[in-house]
């Protein structure tokens, strides 16, 4: 099985998560691509797509790339500088899945906490200290906490999630069964 991981990263969090997933995969062939450096030809059995969340979904570069993908087994993962168990995080992952689900088979998804880039923090600070897109004391505290993400545990969980889904795909293929739709 050949797995290609393609990611877009602003602060380095998505790159770190992609690298951790890549390192953990035990497959015949695997390739890791930074979308900013190279737009790969997708010839693998599985494509894992990682992005940083911008405006509630994939960043612009990944969004444009996702629009070109067709007929693939796809996994989607993302990082954001907010709580991974929040509705915002789930919606951000669902937005990425929605971009690929009609033309591809979705194997699964994963959303992870990440740090906010310094440029984004500067924009929030320019908005003052009141409101959701400001440098409120609560936001400042969250940004400080998120500096430690993704953690090794989060990376391991993402790697486990996709390793499990690849195993499931192979099990089904051996039995000539279709991968069931996943509603993310």
Residue spans for each PLM region:
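Conserved beta-strand elements of the Class I
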Residues: 3-6, 47, 75
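Short acidic/histidine-rich motifs immediately flanking catalytic phosphotransfer sites
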Residues: 41-47
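Conserved beta-strand termini and adjacent loop/short-helix elements that scaffold enzyme active sites
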Residues: 6, 32-35, 112
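Structured loop/turn residues at beta-strand edges in well-structured enzyme cores
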Residues: 1, 42, 104
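Structural alpha-helical scaffold elements that stabilize or flank donor/cofactor-binding regions
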Residues: 40-41, 67
